[in-house]
Structure formats: C-alpha cells, structure tokens
Amino acid sequence: MLPSSRYIRCAGYEIHCTEWGAPEAPVVIAWHGLARTGRDMDALARHLSSRYRVICPDTIGRGLSQWARTPRDEYRLSFYARIAADLFAQLGIDMAHWIGTSMGGAIGTVCASGLFEPQLKGRIMRLLLNDNAPRLADAALERIKAYAGQPPAFDTVMELEAFFRQVYQPYGWLSDAQWRQLTETSTRRLPDGRVTPHYDPAMVQQFTHHENDYLIWDHYDRLHIPVLCLRGAQSDLVLPETTAEMLTRGPGTRGLLQVVEVPGCGHAPALNVPEQFALVDGFLSDT
C-alpha cells in the first residue's frame, strides 16, 4: 500500500503528513525525531496500515512542512502540541494511539497530559515512547545539538548518505534500500547546488531559548493511559536510571508502564524490523 500525501493548515502553517490505511480504521499518530521527517515511519506505517489509519506528520521546520517565522517562539514543545491539536481537528480525529520517536515521544507526552492543549486530554489512548523519557541525558543532548545545529552540506547525495549511515548507526539494522530511502526523504538542495539534511537548522534554538523543554515530569506524572517505553539498549539519551524512575512515578505507579530494552540499537530504534513490529503490535492490541 502506498500512502497519500496531505498538506494541512495547523497553527497558521502548512504541515505535511503522509497517511496510510483506511480512513475508517482506528488512528495511530506516528511522530518522528528531532532532525528527521515523517517518512522515517514508512516501514512501521506500512506494516500497521492493514489495521490502522496511520498519520505521519512532518514537524514544522522539517521535511515538507513550512519553516517557523519566529524560531525562538515556535520551535518548542508547546507549539508542537498546538500543531498536533489542529491536526486532530483538521483530520477529524477523535481518539488515537500515539507512537513517538525521541522528540515525537515528548510531543505525545505533552499532548496526552492536556497541560498545553486541554482539548487533547483523554483523546490519546496509548502512548509508545521510542527512546524517549521525561528526562534526557545532558551529554547526549549536547551531541545531538552539535550535529543538528550545524548540518553539513555535500556535493553529492551519496556523500550525504554516507554521513547519514554514520550519524544514525545507532538506529540498528537498515537494509541498503532503507538507507537509500532515508537519504532521499531527508535531503534538500541548497542554492549553491550542494545537498543537506531536510530541516531548518534554526530548530535547535529550542535548546537555547527553552533549555528545559524536554524535562517533562509534570506532564508524565499526569498520564493515566498505558505507556510503553522502548529503550535502545545502547542509548545514551535515555539512561537506565531514568526508566527506573519512570516506574516509580505517574503511570509507573498505576501499573500502566512497560519498559522494554531493544537490543542492537542506541538512539533510537528504527522500528523497521519484525521483532520491533511485534513489540508495537502487542502494545497496540493489548486490552
């Protein structure tokens, strides 16, 4: 099955998303990581599309979505939640499951808490955090800021693919075809003819102007829905002590949290192989 491509007006911006599956099926929102695009979710969305309507947005400033006019104010979780609320409204979504990689998991957490957008409270049924947690390791955040804030430019797409293979090695196993797709859906050409990753470098202002944006225990503690945290076994962003604390707070104290380590991955599992599909399937279908 091939996805449809949608352009939707959310919070004053044109937001692109790919949509898989039947319109009447239960909805899954699959939201990508910080410097990525919704097309990262293609393999998982294709797998889920026989049973779910899967929506994979490009965050503002990424992929085919518009870039922020005021980066300081709009590259932040509260604005991303506003976009998500408009996405629900524009697409006629009442209830949804949420799968979020890294930043996408944080957006799902703040949406599910209802603190930023009260109209979303109670409308996210299950939350899957793919290598995301309410506190992230400082050293890993510095690493991510370093490569995301100064994206390189190359003469050829093949050079950019080699860069992606290096920087995203912690994703785990990808086939050559998947690396090629990751590259081709993550590339834009600069005015000088070189190619660079497909996002607005100004999005890292989130860390400068909102340095505690990803410290979201107050949102996590308010969750009363099932949560699955997939931690890459070699992740430097989500530490074991953080997942241990998650079990003592919020949904962890209510018997609603599962933590599973994904072998062979760091930050973050690509959600592209049968073993990872099985984890997602089991969580979404668990009643």
Q: Could you say what each language-model-derived stretch is?
A:
Residues 1-29, 50-52, 93-94, 258, ...:
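Alpha/beta-hydrolase fold catalytic core
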Residues 13, 43, 56-99, 118-120:
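Active-site loop/oxyanion-hole signature of alpha/beta-hydrolase fold enzymes
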Residues 13-67:
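Conserved HGGG/HGGXW glycine-rich cap/lid loop of the alpha/beta-hydrolase fold
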Residues 40-42, 65-72, 139-140, 240-241, ...:
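Conserved catalytic-core motifs of eukaryotic protein kinase domains, centered on the activation segment
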Residues 94-138:
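Conserved hydrolase catalytic core segment
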Residues 162-228:
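Alpha/beta-hydrolase
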Residues 224-265:
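Conserved loop-alpha-helix segment in the C-terminal half of the alpha/beta-hydrolase fold
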Residues 265-274:
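Catalytic histidine-centered segment of alpha/beta-hydrolase-like enzymes
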